[in-house]
Amino acid sequence: MHEVSLMEQTLAIAIAQAEDHGASQIHRLTLRVGQQSGVVADALRFAFEVVRQNTMAAEARLEIEEIPVTCRCQHCHENFQPEDWIYRCPHCDQISQTVMDGKQLELASLELS
C-alpha cells in the first residue's frame, strides 16, 4: 500500500506550508487525485487517519476531489473523457494517446489557523 508513504509525504508538505504561514493547526487538506494516478482514494483516507496522529493535522478533515481522465485528440483537436481504457475520440472515432488530465496527485488547498 504505497498510499501510506504518499500521505506521509503529503502531510509533511502540508505541515511545512502551515509552519511557513505561522499556523499552529491544519483544519482541512484538499487533494486532487486523478482517476489514472494509481492511487486508491479509500486507501489514502485510511493512511491519513494513521499518519495525522500527534501532528498539527490531528483534527483535520481530508477532502479528496477525484479528477476524471481527459484526453485530447491529435486528429480533430477535441478534448474528451473516455468511457473506457481505449481512448477513442467520440468526435472523429480515432484513438488518442494524449492524456491531458487525470494522472495527478496534488495538494490543492489547506485550511489553517
Curated annotation (Swiss-Prot):
The keyword Zinc applies. This is Hydrogenase maturation factor HypA. HAMAP family: HypA_HybF. One of its GO terms (biological process) is protein modification process. The lineage of its organism: Bacteria, Bacillati, Cyanobacteriota, Cyanophyceae, Synechococcales. Belongs to the HypA/HybF family. Involved in the maturation of [NiFe] hydrogenases. Required for nickel insertion into the metal center of the hydrogenase. Disruption phenotype: Disruption of the gene abolishes hydrogenase activity but does not affect urease activity. The hydrogenase activity of the mutant can be increased by the addition of nickel. InterPro entries: Hydgase_Ni_incorp_HypA/HybF_CS, HypA/HybF. GO terms for molecular function: nickel cation binding; zinc ion binding. Pfam families: HypA. Ni(2+) binds at residue 2. Zn(2+) binds at residues 73, 76, 89, 92. Gene3D superfamilies: 3.30.2320.80. It comes from Synechocystis sp. (strain ATCC 27184 / PCC 6803 / Kazusa). Disulfide bonds: none annotated. It comes from the Bacteria.
